[in-house]
């Protein structure tokens, strides 16, 4: 299941684990990324908490935790090469995997059609 937030994060949900990243729209707005800071595996976040930071030549921005949960894995590849976020934001450049405290809460997030309408 693919879901989106109004803060421009995407979530690919598989059971009780969501892979989280920023959308193509967000990556395009930020421009070329030069730095990514990710949370530590094992850290717990509530929905809306700042979980990661990205810096581009234009601005620094927070990446928010889309739902309550615990970080179970981070993508070291985007720390080593932030430009991956620009080239494949909704694929290889995921940010972290989140074990969801309440997987059903994802139903309240936007689906792809609603997100496309939101950014149109």
Swiss-Prot record:
It holds the Pfam family GCV_H. It comes from the Bacteria. The keyword Endoplasmic reticulum does not apply. GO terms for cellular component: cytoplasm; glycine cleavage complex. Its cofactor is (R)-lipoate. PANTHER family: GLYCINE CLEAVAGE SYSTEM H PROTEIN, GLYCINE CLEAVAGE SYSTEM H PROTEIN-RELATED. NCBIfam families: gcvH, PRK01202.1. This is Glycine cleavage system H protein. The gene is gcvH.
């Amino acid at each position: 299941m693919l879901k989106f937030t109004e803060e421009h994060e995407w979530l690919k949900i598989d059971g009780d684990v969501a892979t989280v990243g920023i959308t193509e729209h967000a990556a395009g707005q930020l421009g070329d990324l030069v730095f990514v800071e990710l949370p530590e595996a094992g850290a717990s976040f509530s929905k809306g908490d700042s979980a990661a930071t990205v810096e581009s030549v234009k601005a620094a921005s927070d990446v928010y935790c889309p739902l309550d949960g615990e970080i179970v894995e981070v993508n070291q590849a985007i720390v080593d090469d932030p430009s991956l976020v620009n080239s494949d934001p909704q694929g290889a450049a995921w940010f972290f995997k989140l074990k969801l405290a309440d997987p059903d809460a994802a139903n309240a997030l936007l689906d792809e059609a609603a997100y496309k309408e939101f950014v149109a």
